[in-house]
Amino acid sequence: MLTMDDIVREGHPALREVASEVTFPLSDEEKKLGHDMLEFLINSQDEELAEKYGLRGGVGIAAPQLAVTKRILAIHVHDEKDRLYSYVLYNPKIRSHSVQQACLSGGEGCLSVDREVPGYVVRSERVTIDAFDENGIPLKLRFKDYPAIVVQHEIDHLNGIMFYDHINKENPSYLPPDVDVFG
């Protein structure tokens, strides 16, 4: 079972590397990593387990956060209608994105960042993702609003990008016009 001790923190070189694609069939280790990542997210959202094991609540995690520079991510997040998006994605890529942008009112956080980073992180409000499941079956997934923000945050990790790289350095509270704000 993964715990917070397994998650590398900002400054670790794996967080700034571009992760490598996995090849299919996946190794047992790659499959286990995906399962463990999703299990961590589920456990972190369970109050009892989170308290017992000292887990910070998370809705997404990427392999580089575990010092594994492979293109694997997991998300476990509900949208505003309480629909669950729970996936382990291998080699995910953004196929298309909306022109409309969105951000979270309180900014973003990250399991690899142990400090508050004020500022808006503006992202696409909708994205279509191409990825594979653990059996190598191609997936085409559409995300909007909060789940879209989460999956973009995790794909950024696969490209060596941290959420605060998107924040306006001169004016972190600057919000471009017509950006939808959630939360």
UniProtKB/Swiss-Prot annotation:
Keywords: Hydrolase, Iron, Metal-binding, Protein biosynthesis. It catalyses: N-terminal N-formyl-L-methionyl-[peptide] + H2O = N-terminal L-methionyl-[peptide] + formate. Its EC number is 3.5.1.88. GO terms for molecular function: metal ion binding; peptide deformylase activity. One of its GO terms (biological process) is co-translational protein modification. The keyword Iron applies. Disulfide bonds: none annotated. It is an enzyme of class 3 (hydrolase). The keyword Hydrolase applies. Its cofactor is Fe(2+). Fe cation binds at C110, H153, H157. It comes from the Bacteria. CDD domains: Pep_deformylase (cd00487). Binds 1 Fe(2+) ion. Coiled coil: none annotated. Signal peptide: none annotated. The active site is at E154. Removes the formyl group from the N-terminal Met of newly synthesized proteins. Requires at least a dipeptide for an efficient rate of reaction. N-terminal L-methionine is a prerequisite for activity but the enzyme has broad specificity at other positions. PANTHER family: PEPTIDE DEFORMYLASE (PTHR10458), PEPTIDE DEFORMYLASE 2 (PTHR10458:SF8). Belongs to the polypeptide deformylase family. This is Peptide deformylase.
